[in-house]
């Protein structure tokens, strides 16, 4: 089974298009799933969560989100993903229904993780994101943490946005988090939702294990998804194009501890 999922662009309902729907039924992922929707003006979507929690991330535009008798209006902070403004999200717990209504065009990512635990519905405004500039040389990226492991707002879900400029690498040097060996390393699946600027661009992503029993290198296009059930997973961005991806992570324990590939760890220590 390939780890690369191309854009679907399927009409789901009036004014709502399904761009991605990656889950346990069509992928090797057990702990993570993702859905990406594009809304025309005056369109809506509803869903009921059963044995899953969800993080609803407003990638572009503004929407109204309802869940558990709560209504959040004007959720969203940017007209384009590449505005690089931290956006708004809503966390919804298992057993609840939610609705999304768009007065204008919008793009939404819904991240899922299986759980039987309940947490309060929560609006996560972009202005509380932990923003980091990581790396040096040609290994620089902008990181916007939506739902990191130090915010106790979810049972399993971790969410983060990463911007990588032209001719840089990210998720690099290669690291993995597929061993349940805390505190050294946590077992977390990971899903990448990719976009590029300009849209005709592509990035390269390699997913591989130490023994190379898994070793897949992909040319990833705009709005593609890459799933990482295990292994290292670096991303390279060609000259002339900028990269965005949103990471969905989940596993047995909601902690992100990773292991760098030892043969490439020297890259971190360069002066």
Curated annotation (Swiss-Prot):
Alphabetic keyword roster: Isomerase
GO biological process: inositol catabolic process
Enzyme Commission numbers on file: 5.3.1.30
Keyword Ribosomal protein: no
InterPro entries per record: Deoxy-glucuronate_isom_IolB, IolB_Bacilli, KduI/IolB_isomerase, RmlC-like_jellyroll, RmlC_Cupin_sf
Job of this protein: Involved in the isomerization of 5-deoxy-glucuronate (5DG) to 5-dehydro-2-deoxy-D-gluconate (DKG or 2-deoxy-5-keto-D-gluconate).
Name of the protein this chain belongs to: 5-deoxy-glucuronate isomerase
């Amino acid at each position: 089974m390939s780890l690369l999922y191309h854009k679907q662009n399927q009409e789901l309902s009036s004014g709502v298009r399904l761009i991605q729907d990656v889950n346990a039924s069509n992928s090797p992922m057990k702990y993570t799933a993702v859905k990406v929707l594009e809304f025309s003006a005056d369109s809506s979507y509803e869903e009921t969560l059963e044995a899953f929690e969800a993080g609803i991330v407003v990638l572009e535009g503004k929407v109204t989100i309802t869940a558990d008798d709560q209504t959040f209006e004007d959720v969203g902070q940017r007209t384009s993903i590449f505005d690089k403004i931290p956006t708004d999200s809503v966390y919804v717990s298992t057993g609840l229904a939610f609705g999304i209504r768009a007065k204008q065009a919008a793009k939404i990512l819904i991240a899922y993780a299986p759980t039987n635990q309940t947490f309060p519905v929560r609006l996560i405004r972009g202005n509380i994101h932990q923003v980091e500039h990581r790396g040096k040389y040609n290994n620089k990226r902008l990181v916007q943490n939506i739902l990191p492991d130090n915010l106790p707002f979810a049972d399993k879900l971790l969410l983060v946005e990463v911007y990588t400029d032209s001719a840089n690498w990210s998720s690099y040097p290669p690291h993995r988090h597929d061993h349940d060996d805390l505190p050294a390393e946590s077992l977390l699946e990971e899903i990448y939702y990719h976009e590029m600027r300009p849209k005709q661009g592509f990035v390269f992503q390699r997913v591989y294990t130490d023994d190379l029993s898994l070793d897949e290198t992909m040319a990833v296009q705009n709005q593609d998804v890459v799933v990482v059930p295990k292994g290292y997973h670096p991303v390279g961005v060609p000259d002339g194009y900028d990269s965005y991806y949103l990471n969905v992570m989940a596993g047995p324990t909601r902690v992100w501890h990773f292991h760098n590939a030892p043969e490439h760890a020297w890259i971190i220590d360069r002066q």
